[in-house]
Amino acid sequence: MTAAQTAGGYVPLNERPHGGHAKLLGLVGAGKRVLDIGCSSGYLARPLVQRGCTVVGIEQDLVAAEQAREVCAEVLVGDAEEMELPFEPASFDVLLCGDLVEHLRDPERFLARIQPLLRPDGRLVLTTPNVANWANRLGLLVGRWRYTDRGILDRTHLHLFTRATLVETLERAGYSVVELDYTVPVPGVGTAGVEAAAHAVGRLRPSLFAYQFVVSAAPA
């Protein structure tokens, strides 16, 4: 099951301005050649194509891959960590890893392996949950650490990151962090004003309040 897949289908694009999807799309930009790793049904590829990007996807779920082929220039089917990637060095402007690295068996090794695919001015753009979020810290204080079907402690997450360990992992894999943003969702409240206020509070201490990190990194 990919990061964007649920038992009932595939997670739709969240276009809220302070949400992870909108921030990812903003970091990718327009008119880029993008490798979308773990592309799911193409929910991120679709708006990128509408912005003039050429998107190549990798997806191991057959049903999702078929949906992604409707919008991607090409979709490779398989486990990205295991497959031979048939691309020349410096083939892409952007390597897109939306909610991917926490699912990988060896994130650092994989990120290092794909780094040569970036053009010199290219970017790795990714999101991943913040395991040091205040709710998890509070749970530890009261002796509670429960895995769930979704969220930061999703049962399918193999690696969890704090802000510091994420930066360290990227640097060891051959990247330099250019921008590190975050999301602070407000469950059950969808107004732009409330979300903007939550984001402003998160700015006071992102390592505590961030639910998810949104990163742009350049080849070092």
Report the location of each language-model feature:
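Substrate-binding/catalytic lobe of Class I Rossmann-like enzymes that use SAM or dcSAM, i.e.
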Residues: 167-176
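Conserved N-terminal segment of class I S-adenosyl-L-methionine
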Residues: 1-90, 94-96, 108-111, 126-128, ...
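Short glycine/proline- and charge-enriched loop/turn segments
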Residues: 142-152, 193-199
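Acceptor-substrate binding/catalytic loop of class I
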Residues: 148-165
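A short glycine-rich, Lys/Arg-flanked "PGG" loop and its adjoining helix->strand segment in the class I
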Residues: 109-123
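Conserved class I S-adenosyl-L-methionine
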Residues: 126-148
